[in-house]
Amino acid sequence: MLEAWMPKSGKPSTGTTPADFAPTQWNIIYLLMTVGSLVAALSISIQPLLLDKIFGIAFEKEGAVNADIQVVAEIVSIVCVGWFGLLSDRIGRVRIIATGFLIAVAGAAMSLLSLQIGLAFGAAGLVLFYLTRVLLTVGADTVQLQLSTLVGDVSSRANRPRLMGNLVFMMVFGGTMLSAIIMQMADYKGGVFIIMCLPLLIGIAGFQMTRESLRDVAQPQQAPTGDEHPLRQVWSVITSDPRLQLAFAAAFYTRADVIILSLFFSLWCISVSDLVGVTRTYATAHAAVMIGLLGLAVLAAIPLWRSFIERHSRISAIGASLSLAAVGYIWLGMFANPFNWLVALPLLMVGIGHAGCFVTLQVLTVDVSPKPILGAMVGAGYLVGGLGTVMLVQSGGYYFDALGPRAPFILMGTGKMLVTLYAAWLLANGIDETCDHHLKSTRKVDWKPLVFLTAALPFVWLIGRSVIEGYFSNGSLGEAPVGFVNRYLGDWAFTFLIISLSMRPVQEITGIKSLAKYRRMIGLFAFFYAVLHVLAYVTLEWALNLGDMASDIYKRPFILLGLAAFLLLIPLAFTSTNSQIKKIGGKRWKRLHRATYVINALVALHFILAANHENGEPYVYAAAVIVLLWYRFYQWRGGNVLRALRIG
């Protein structure tokens, strides 16, 4: 299918040497990165205004609905863009870049249609708007990721910080400064329509420019065979280098920076616009100006960080930049009025920290990655950043609606502090770089503590907010309504159930056998959040009143589906230890734990029936469960799923 838009300037199979990489190609790359990030930024920045004015989403649901749309877009994008990253090692980066622009064109065209449906029928256009956001996110992210990989192909260790810094500079310029200028049109008649037309025009121009002007550098790799599966190689590289483990942990929070700020700062401005006496279009434009200041800080800081990482440890650079951004987020969360121009100060701190972390991650990943799997390595970094975006946007949406518009920023700050502590732990244990950027120690670091801390984050966030709001002193969850706590815990229980269910297929497809040692931990965290979900319903919502609970179950019978799933989950949790496996016997234990398939199906149905009609997230989760259950059924029937799903 990709043959139809083979670049006219040369076939990927022949390749181009870095010395032959013309200056005009650099200009094209920088321009394409700018417009690719602009498409992503415009789609996020305009979203809160569209949901409020066009689709008529109620104020009390705005945070959750905005977050749900972003989460759905990120989940689909993770799968698609990750696959494109693997594929690019074999067919070249340029064809994938052209494909990304075409996907963005399709999304932009649908956005104009969803706008008309929204104007005519209100929330009825949301389904199409979900699809629009998915396509725009997949297209824009594909373009940006593959351009970064292409620069990695042509750069060397000596010039990589400079070239990657230039690329990040242009990406931030398009995603913040240029976006902020264009978003000012939202306050004028017809401005929203013009803003929505721009991604369509950009996509068409970007596709044509890619075909006409870009050429591949790296030689295409042969399809993997046997033990050479690229995902297995990616895993081996990451697990053998503590710097990459830190980099991927930092990517979990760093990629979400611009999305979190663009989305929730805009929502914050819109939510208080009536109180300060300004229109909502003005509030959207004001938010864009502040995000533009953030971008200005990033642009100004990139040369400084580029010089720093050329001369100092990248581990120190990641720790310093994360801590700076963390302080900025927490400071931002202390402001009561987003129209106070002093909020620019914490935004500048976040921008400076984001610049250092993002540039360091790009340079470090390309430096350490073997050339044959560079696309897969960059895609793996995107995958981790996408998962972080899903978790942070999902939690941020809940916190925005239930606890107030500043809560998502506190969330980001505390998470970045956690990774900063991990960087400090590495340095304290002698795991650092020499002056020429080689590891001083070959000591390997176990991932279990990092996986545990990441899985515990949703609970830590909830407890931390409860302490801040005085739960333990006054016996209530502060400002947090019980419904928020209940849904929050239930969503995370289901998230970890799906992750646990997916680990065996991923292990079988990629051959990464070491994933098995994390499956039990993930499954127990699913049970942990399920227990908290049930306890919140029984105690916080109904105060152990059995009569009221029975009446509620009669009105909402889908609760029985969740209860049945929880009862099935209990024996699985209590038989997960090695001693219980030996006591029961391996075959009987496997038969018992097949109940996880039924549990996931029950929870998916429970989630769909419990959600409101504006929420598309349950259907994405249910689709994931269907795919995973199909995989197990097909394997049970003797089908060769591995051959069908392996890249190559």
UniProtKB/Swiss-Prot annotation:
<dbReference type="Pfam" id="PF01794">
    <property type="entry name" value="Ferric_reduct"/>
</dbReference>
<feature type="transmembrane region" description="Helical">
    <location>
        <begin position="317"/>
        <end position="335"/>
    </location>
</feature>
<dbReference type="GO" id="GO:0030091">
    <property type="term" value="P:protein repair"/>
</dbReference>
<feature type="transmembrane region" description="Helical">
    <location>
        <begin position="407"/>
        <end position="428"/>
    </location>
</feature>
<dbReference type="InterPro" id="IPR013130">
    <property type="entry name" value="Fe3_Rdtase_TM_dom"/>
</dbReference>
<dbReference type="GO" id="GO:0010181">
    <property type="term" value="F:FMN binding"/>
</dbReference>
<dbReference type="GO" id="GO:0110146">
    <property type="term" value="C:magnetosome membrane"/>
</dbReference>
<feature type="transmembrane region" description="Helical">
    <location>
        <begin position="558"/>
        <end position="574"/>
    </location>
</feature>
<comment type="function">
    <text>Required for correct biomineralization of the magnetosome; probably converts and then transports some form of iron. It is partially functionally redundant with MamH. May function with MamX, MamY amd Mms6 in biomineralization. Despite its strong similarity to MsrQ (AC V6EX82) this protein does not genetically interact with bona fide MsrP (AC V6F0A4), which is encoded elsewhere in the genome.</text>
</comment>
<comment type="similarity">
    <text>In the N-terminal section; belongs to the major facilitator superfamily.</text>
</comment>
<keyword id="KW-0472">Membrane</keyword>
<keyword id="KW-1133">Transmembrane helix</keyword>
<feature type="transmembrane region" description="Helical">
    <location>
        <begin position="94"/>
        <end position="113"/>
    </location>
</feature>
<dbReference type="GO" id="GO:0009055">
    <property type="term" value="F:electron transfer activity"/>
</dbReference>
<feature type="transmembrane region" description="Helical">
    <location>
        <begin position="285"/>
        <end position="305"/>
    </location>
</feature>
<keyword id="KW-0406">Ion transport</keyword>
<feature type="region of interest" description="Major facilitator domain">
    <location>
        <begin position="1"/>
        <end position="431"/>
    </location>
</feature>
<keyword id="KW-0812">Transmembrane</keyword>
<feature type="transmembrane region" description="Helical">
    <location>
        <begin position="618"/>
        <end position="634"/>
    </location>
</feature>
<dbReference type="GO" id="GO:0005886">
    <property type="term" value="C:plasma membrane"/>
</dbReference>
<feature type="transmembrane region" description="Helical">
    <location>
        <begin position="341"/>
        <end position="361"/>
    </location>
</feature>
<feature type="region of interest" description="Ferric reductase-like domain, required for correct magnetite crystal formation">
    <location>
        <begin position="444"/>
        <end position="645"/>
    </location>
</feature>
<dbReference type="GO" id="GO:0006826">
    <property type="term" value="P:iron ion transport"/>
</dbReference>
<keyword id="KW-0408">Iron</keyword>
<dbReference type="InterPro" id="IPR020846">
    <property type="entry name" value="MFS_dom"/>
</dbReference>
<protein>
    <recommendedName>
        <fullName>Magnetosome protein MamZ</fullName>
    </recommendedName>
</protein>
<feature type="transmembrane region" description="Helical">
    <location>
        <begin position="188"/>
        <end position="207"/>
    </location>
</feature>
<dbReference type="InterPro" id="IPR011701">
    <property type="entry name" value="MFS"/>
</dbReference>
<dbReference type="GO" id="GO:0022857">
    <property type="term" value="F:transmembrane transporter activity"/>
</dbReference>
<feature type="transmembrane region" description="Helical">
    <location>
        <begin position="373"/>
        <end position="395"/>
    </location>
</feature>
<feature type="transmembrane region" description="Helical">
    <location>
        <begin position="28"/>
        <end position="49"/>
    </location>
</feature>
<keyword id="KW-0091">Biomineralization</keyword>
<comment type="subunit">
    <text>Probably interacts with FtsZ-like and MamY proteins.</text>
</comment>
<feature type="transmembrane region" description="Helical">
    <location>
        <begin position="449"/>
        <end position="468"/>
    </location>
</feature>
<keyword id="KW-1281">Magnetosome</keyword>
<feature type="transmembrane region" description="Helical">
    <location>
        <begin position="119"/>
        <end position="143"/>
    </location>
</feature>
<feature type="transmembrane region" description="Helical">
    <location>
        <begin position="163"/>
        <end position="182"/>
    </location>
</feature>
<feature type="transmembrane region" description="Helical">
    <location>
        <begin position="595"/>
        <end position="612"/>
    </location>
</feature>
<dbReference type="InterPro" id="IPR022837">
    <property type="entry name" value="MsrQ-like"/>
</dbReference>
<keyword id="KW-0813">Transport</keyword>
<dbReference type="GO" id="GO:0016679">
    <property type="term" value="F:oxidoreductase activity, acting on diphenols and related substances as donors"/>
</dbReference>
<feature type="transmembrane region" description="Helical">
    <location>
        <begin position="518"/>
        <end position="538"/>
    </location>
</feature>
